[in-house]
Every structure is written in structure tokens, then in C-alpha cells.
């Protein structure tokens, strides 16, 4: 990177831009054409964190974690279990990517902000705080909500029930309540699909 480039925000913006155009790989593996992007996923997660009504959780911090947690995927891509990459290797790759991304901010006198972004990522990865745990629940819930949207979009021609496993890991009562809403509506939807086939 030359000196002129190192003093520009553009390389950092380019990283963020890739999040807008990189599809969530899991949907591609299940035949969803033109699926949501990584940024689509993080945006809805961010909005959902703002609905947190638990006074013991800092929802502003949750929002920050939500919009940072998959940032490394702008470099490493959306790694799914299909790739057979170990959790340790995935964490190593993503941690290195976060260093690379945030280093672009240092020449712009944004060292503190770069450090905050890395800390938010590591907090999420380690699930070391109530906020990180809440965002992990939101991450799983958002995927299940998206699953149901795709099932409805394809009028019941695609059964994506293999994604529902994530719901069993959701802990926070608020997110569990939302999950129950989605799963109940999904049950009604599939009952209607089966009825039409009779």
C-alpha cells in the first residue's frame, strides 16, 4: 500500500463493500439463488439488538457487536461447516482478517476505533459478556427467521428445516419468545402446504 493510499478511508470502505456483495454461503448450498448478503444479515441483527428490553444488557454495545461480528468475512468469506474448517482454524483466519482490516484505520489517526472494533469481534467470538451472548442468540434467530422467509418465498417447495437446530441453542427469554413466534407460524405454514397437496 503506498503512502497516498494509506491515508485514505477507501481501502476500509472497500472491505465493508464486500460484505454487501458477499452472499451467505449456507443458502447457496441449499439452492437459494441470490441469497441475502453478509451485510443484510448483520443489518437485521443490528435492528433486532435495539429491541432488547433487558436492563442488564447494554443494547448499544450489542448493536456495535452485531455490525462488527462478521466483518472478517469480507476477507475470508462466509465459512460454513461444509468447508470442513475447524473452529480453531476459522477463528485464526478471522482474527488475522480483523487485524488486517483494522490496521487500515491506524494511519487515519483512528487507532482507538480500530482497537474497539477488534475488541468487539473478540468479545463476540469468546461470548465473554451478556451482550456477546445476546448477540449470538440474535445471530441464530435471524438465520431461522431468514430460513422461514425463504420457505415462504418458494411456496413450500424448499424445506429448510435443517437450519432449525440453531434454535435449541438460544438462551435469552426475549429471543426464545421471538423464536417461538416464528416456529409457530412456520408450523401453520407447512400445515397449509400439506393441506393444499391433499
Swiss-Prot record:
Q: Which is one GO molecular function term here?
A: metal ion binding
Residues noted as binding a divalent metal cation 2 in the record, renumbered to the chain = 73, 78-79
Task: State where a divalent metal cation 1 binds.
Answer: 41, 69-70, 139
A Gene Ontology CC term for this entry? cytosol
Q: Which residues form the HD domain?
A: 38-144
On the tree of life, the source organism's domain of life is Eukaryota
The coenzyme or cofactor needed here is: Mn(2+); Co(2+); Mg(2+)
Main site of residence? cytoplasm
Question: Function of this protein?
Answer: Catalyzes the dephosphorylation of the nucleoside 5'-monophosphates deoxyadenosine monophosphate (dAMP), deoxycytidine monophosphate (dCMP), deoxyguanosine monophosphate (dGMP) and deoxythymidine monophosphate (dTMP).
Question: Which protein family is it in?
Answer: Belongs to the HDDC2 family.
Put simply, this protein is called 5'-deoxynucleotidase hdd1
Q: What is the lineage of its organism?
A: Eukaryota, Fungi, Dikarya, Ascomycota, Taphrinomycotina
Gene symbol of the encoding locus: hdd1
